[in-house]
Each structure stands twice: as C-alpha cells, then as structure tokens.
C-alpha cells in the first residue's frame, strides 16, 4: 500500500497536461539546438560558404552542377548559404546555365536534415517507417521536380527567362528585406555557444566533428522522447486543432508550411519538427505532404525578400537567382501536385523506401549517405 501511494504523486506529475506540454516545448527546443549543432558542425568541417564555393569550382556541365549543389548543401546544411554563394559566383562570371542546376541541387540537398531527424525513430520499426516516409517524400518530390524542370530549362530556358522578366519589373521597387529577422538564431545561439565551449579543446576539425556527433545524438534522444510525449498530448482538442491547421486540406497545409517557414526562415527546421508527429502517428505522410510543399515555397520567399534589398551591379543577378528558386518550387507544386498521377509518385516512392528501410536499417542509412554525399562526391572526383 505504502509503495503504491508513494508513487502516485510522481505518476500524476508525469501524466499531467502541464508537465507534458512543458516537456514538448523543451524537447522541441532541444531538437532545434540539435539541428543547429549539426548544421554548425558541418559548416565548420566543410569551410562554410568558402568551402561551398570551392566545391562549385568542379562544375563543368549542368548535371555535375546539380550534384555539386546537393553536396554543397548537405555539407554546409544551409540552402540559403549555398544560394548566396551561387549569387556571388554568378556576379563573378559563372554562367546562369550552371547556376540554375546548382540552385536545383541546393533545393534537394536541404532535405537531408529532416531525413537525419527521422533516424531518431530507427529503434522502433513502426515509428521509423512512418517517420522515414514523411521525411523522404520531400526528397522524392524535389527529385521529381528536377527530372521534369531541368530538361525544360536546358532546352527552353523556362526558369531563367521567366525570372529575368520578373526581376526587371521588381528592380527598383521598395525594399522588402528580411535581413536580420532571423527569429531562431537568438533562441538557440546560447546553447550552441555552450556546445562550442565544451568541444573547443579539440584540435583541427575535431571540434566540428564533435559538434556534429553531439547534435546527432541529441536528435536521436529528443526525437524518441518527443514521440512518446506527443502520444500523450495529441489527444482530444489539441489533436483536433492541429489537424485543422495542417490537415484540413491541401491548400491549408501548403499555406501553413509556407507561413511557418517564412517565420523561422528555415525549411529544414519546419519539416524536421513535423517528423516526430509522423513517427508518433499523429499525421501520416499524405497529410504532411502539402505542408512540406509549403515549406519548399516558404524558404524561397525569404530569399526573394532579402534579394529585393540588394542594390548595385549585383541586384539583377541576385533577384534573378532568387526568382529562379521561387519559380522552380511554385511551378513544381502546381504541376506535380496539380496532376493526380504525378502527385502520387513521391508518396508511393517514399512509402516503398520506408517499408524496405524499416526492414533493413543499413539500406536506409545507405540511402542517406549515397544520395546526399557519395554520389555527388564521386561525380566531383570523376570530373577532377
């Protein structure tokens, strides 16, 4: 009797709504810190923007440029940084015909972050299957977009001509810059500084590698814990409200994904936070699909607003590249999601890969390493 009575207060605290929601907030914050740590570590290891520029020096045709865009973004962990590098390279004489495939590659490379987050569910086959499918639907949508629009661009210059026309109209309009409006950085910077301080004693690239490892381990822990807590809190009214915000319909999902991504200025963050919801069974891949597409659009709008504030000789080029990114994602959403047959392809591919990957975890890990690192790196070596 005594042991039962003494355990009751602990159980009531652990199951109280307030405790659970505080746990959700804490774990979401730690996931943001973990994703930031992985990104920070990769930037330090690869040399950041300078490293990305060195990678692009190997581009000698559009297909290699595409793969190098994937590799650079996977290493730097920031499509915004890579796109900024591309703008600088174009201003320095890089042909637009090379720059546009690089932007497409950056668009694909940024999807690695939520795929890494899905690996946090790898110990539970059912959770991992749901989480991996929700993450890789982003990969397959962007792959399909590249397969459709890269040939069209090479043959007709669809994106470049459209972007140049719109850039000419927008140039000289009022500044709409969002530079400096990074809402996430002030929140996670203190924690990242603590991690930096803890690994600062390591020599050379050791600190960057340690930061990546800490980030990945933190992701694995937090995603597992968050999945369990979400199963307790996502019931009743809370679940109903979230479904209204994200799962009411395709347009609502796309709008929500766009808005949230513009606010946090990171599609990686937006989509990564949805993965535990998928792993916990709160949403399925089909329901999160439109939200993911909205995140694709949202990250390009941020870059566009920043580009409109650039003046001088690089203004036209900056706007053109930013608009290429916007139009690429807008056209892809309209065409792929608008055509029922095409709409289903990313979902089917993601669910098939997740089913196979949940049965063979090494295959899932090989997919991540192969698509984002090994294949582009091999191509870079081949053309060296």
Please describe what each predicted stretch is.
Residues 7-66, 70, 191-254:
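Helix-loop-helix hairpins and the membrane-proximal interhelical loops
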Residues 73-107, 122, 168-169, 174-176, ...:
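Membrane-interfacial helix-loop connectors
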Residues 114-126, 229-233, 275-281:
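C-terminal ends of transmembrane helices
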Residues 21, 29-33, 116-186, 217-224, ...:
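Juxtamembrane and boundary regions of transmembrane helices in multi-pass small-molecule transporters
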Residues 24, 28, 57, 69, ...:
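Alpha-helical transmembrane segments of multi-pass membrane proteins, especially transporters
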Residues 4, 109-118, 235-260, 264, ...:
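Hydrophobic alpha-helical transmembrane segments of integral membrane proteins
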Residues 43-130, 134-144:
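Early transmembrane hairpin of solute transport permeases
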